[in-house]
Amino acid sequence: MGPPLAPRPAHVPGEAGPRRTRESRPGAVSFADVAVYFSPEEWECLRPAQRALYRDVMRETFGHLGALGFSVPKPAFISWVEGEVEAWSPEAQDPDGESSAAFSRGQGQEAGSRDGNEEKERLKKCPKQKEVAHEVAVKEWWPSVACPEFCNPRQSPMNPWLKDTLTRRLPHSCPDCGRNFSYPSLLASHQRVHSGERPFSCGQCQARFSQRRYLLQHQFIHTGEKPYPCPDCGRRFRQRGSLAIHRRAHTGEKPYACSDCKSRFTYPYLLAIHQRKHTGEKPYSCPDCSLRFAYTSLLAIHRRIHTGEKPYPCPDCGRRFTYSSLLLSHRRIHSDSRPFPCVECGKGFKRKTALEAHRWIHRSCSERRAWQQAVVGRSEPIPVLGGKDPPVHFRHFPDIFQECG
């Protein structure tokens, strides 16, 4: 048997006593002593899944009090919990009119009033501390209600319940996939994946959803609300997940790596598109000529050949072009831009093809004579000299080489 518990220090009048539960007597335990309450503001901050989990925990806690032998009447709070109402109700508030930290206060109203007010203000600023305060209060309350029947954990008939409660091992298994859940509400929500049930409908467009949180996210489309702003650029998003993905553009995070070339990407769809280079996959086919393409953008550009679409007009002369590259090349006619200079003589050209044709003038006479001899009296393709064939107009006018004799 373990060592006896040290006695609590006696309360001195005028001083704040040690934090204990509401009642110092072990037998005077009510559901309000171990329940957690939320204010209307705190309740609004909870997501639907968190509210469902909270209801399950409160129902379970109320049932455990009865299993421990405490005669506890069913409070109105439990009736509100069992109704699974999403809106906050006065039945959900602390029956003593205090915050959820009321179960952890000292003896004496006058001595502990200052600490109680400070505690309530602290919990208002940080509602998550309710969970910590609740755990501390249960640990302080549990030895006071323990009797010799439950003191020895090996002989205690409630030991299995304690083990399951403390470790949260209350599995509810899905009969379809075998996945386990801690609470029946989570299991019921999961089973809609298998059944296809969509009990939550949008009142404006009649779209249906399997979970309430999906409906709430969808309703942002109708309201136009975007409650999640980016702290870096101020752009707003409807969903928290979309904001997290967007922030990768600022952080430079690239969590998706290609297994073939180790390239990294910010988004998974970019990785999937990139991997087509390695696999050779071309999932998009042209309905007119059956050519296949790896990307939808290439297919859209190719289809302009069949449709005759020319979406790029020249702002100077109005001539239209099928591709933006052709428009860019054409606009050099209206400007003095000559971005392709010859490295031999410095002459500039507006097109790269014109530069390549010009550079044949600077070839040695032996190279040009060899090409001229090769094409005389032959019908075969012209041999490649220096990695490239002569320009087309050179083939039709071989007298251009007469300057070399």
UniProtKB/Swiss-Prot annotation:
Protein source organism: Homo sapiens
Keyword Zinc included in the entry's annotation: yes
Region of interest: Disordered: 1-26, 88-126
Pfam families: KRAB, zf-C2H2
Family per record: Belongs to the krueppel C2H2-type zinc-finger protein family.
UniProt entry keywords in alphabetical sequence: DNA-binding, Metal-binding, Nucleus, Repeat, Transcription, Transcription regulation, Zinc, Zinc-finger
Protein name as it appears in the record: Zinc finger protein 785
A GO cellular-component term linked to this record: nucleus
PROSITE patterns: KRAB, ZINC_FINGER_C2H2_1, ZINC_FINGER_C2H2_2
Entry-linked CDD domains: KRAB_A-box (cd07765)
Zinc fingers classed as C2H2-type: ranges: 172-194, 200-222, 228-250, 256-278, 284-306, 312-334, 340-362
